[in-house]
């Protein structure tokens, strides 16, 4: 609904199929007019014949190179075929399907079903997040969004500094806090990006010189996991594992909302764990809004 509003598309009726009770709670809080119908697998889509637009995306874990690599045999991936079933029953004028980059074989199968070639859009054009996704749609004249030049410094809290223009991914996963063993294993691979300003008594007027950065990919990981922090890359300091633990923090739910170009506090009211999950499973709103603007042309 946020994307439709930003695209200037008037909505008379919005029906959602969602089984995650926390995602439903967020939807009801922000848009009480949404009709929630629960499990898509039991839906009789003929009820909605004549609706103008169907938009959706099956869980990315089933298609992605990451995760368990279960592809089309994964029950989560089979939700794609529910999308196909919905289109056949409803026969909307327009559709939009989102999914992750995947093997060419799987991409080609989806393309064959959808009847249109996908467009690859990186969220970093409209946000501070690196998030490449494929979009299959018959909405006309979809081009790449203009780069808004949004940097990580634009979304992080005032207690942090960043150091790159466009970053590698950081995963905002469901679950646990950072621990010593995690840093021992991965600290050399994580790109150093944020330092809390209250470390060593604050920076005062002599803040370290930093190079400002695009961020992170927010994504969820099945079965829990860690939320890697953004870490300083100050050449004047060589951090030990314990020192890294002292000067790092998680990306906050508010920052994740901004990375997904949602309104501040959109997921407020849930636990942080559930906020991370909802945000990781969601879309970058301004990418969707960019595509939906084609409905008005």
Label the model's feature ranges.
Residues 32-39:
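Conserved SAM-binding strand-loop segment of SAM-dependent methyltransferases
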Residues 22, 223, 284:
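Conserved Rossmann-like nucleotide-cofactor binding loop
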Residues 27:
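Conserved SAM-binding loop
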Residues 15-21, 98-99:
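Conserved acidic E/D residue at the C-terminus of a beta-strand in Rossmann-like folds
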Residues 207, 244-269:
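FAD-binding beta-loop-beta segment adjacent to the flavin cofactor pocket
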Residues 1-9:
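Conserved SAM-binding loop of SAM-dependent methyltransferases across substrates and taxa
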Residues 43-53, 60-225, 231-241, 247-249:
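Class I S-adenosyl-L-methionine
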């Amino acid at each position: 609904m946020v994307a439709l509003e930003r695209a200037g598309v008037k909505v008379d009726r919005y029906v959602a199929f969602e089984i995650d009770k926390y995602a439903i709670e967020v939807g009801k809080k922000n848009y009480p007019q949404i009709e929630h119908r629960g499990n898509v697998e039991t839906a009789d889509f003929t009820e909605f014949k004549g609706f103008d637009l169907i938009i959706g995306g099956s869980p990315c874990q089933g298609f992605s190179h990451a995760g368990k690599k279960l592809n089309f045999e994964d029950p989560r991936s089979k939700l794609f075929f529910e999308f196909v079933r919905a289109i056949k029953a409803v026969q909307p004028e327009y559709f939009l399907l989102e999914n992750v980059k995947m093997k060419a074989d799987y991409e080609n199968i989806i393309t064959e079903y959808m009847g249109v070639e996908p467009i690859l859009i990186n969220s970093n054009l409209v946000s501070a997040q690196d998030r490449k996704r494929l979009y299959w749609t018959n909405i006309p004249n979809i081009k790449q969004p203009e780069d808004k030049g949004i940097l990580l410094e634009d979304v992080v809290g005032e207690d942090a500094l960043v150091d790159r223009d466009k970053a590698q991914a950081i995963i905002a996963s469901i679950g646990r806090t950072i621990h010593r063993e995690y840093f021992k294993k991965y600290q050399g691979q994580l790109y150093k990006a944020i330092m809390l300003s209250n470390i060593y008594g604050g920076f005062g007027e002599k803040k370290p010189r930093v190079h400002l950065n695009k961020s992170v990919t927010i994504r969820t990981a099945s079965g829990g996991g860690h939320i890697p922090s953004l870490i300083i890359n100050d050449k004047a300091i060589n951090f030990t594992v314990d020192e890294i633990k002292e000067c790092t923090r998680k990306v906050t739910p508010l920052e994740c909302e901004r990375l997904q170009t949602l309104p501040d506090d959109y997921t407020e009211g849930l636990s942080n764990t559930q906020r991370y999950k909802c945000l990781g499973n969601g879309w970058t709103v301004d990418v969707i809004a960019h595509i939906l603007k084609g409905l008005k042309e």
